[in-house]
């Protein structure tokens, strides 16, 4: 396990969780993720990525929601947990993410090689 893999795991543990509304995919748009996070995910074809991008969607959004929910990237986990990425349906954790943790996540994302999900 690399230092970045350990850091990803550490940061994930600090992000609060909440229950999404079934069928909502508002957070499932095209985003960039660290190459380390991308390496954890099943490989999608270029055609699958292109089709999703044409719909301004995520290649991992399936008919029943996120196909990679347990391995979803940090940016996906942040959605709805911070005032800067509020859920438009009003869903949120009991306590929003600590501002220091959010800054730490953004610093990590800024310091790592980003690729389009």
Question: In which residue ranges do the predicted regions lie?
Answer:
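Short loop/turn segments that flank or connect secondary-structure elements
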Residues: 1-117
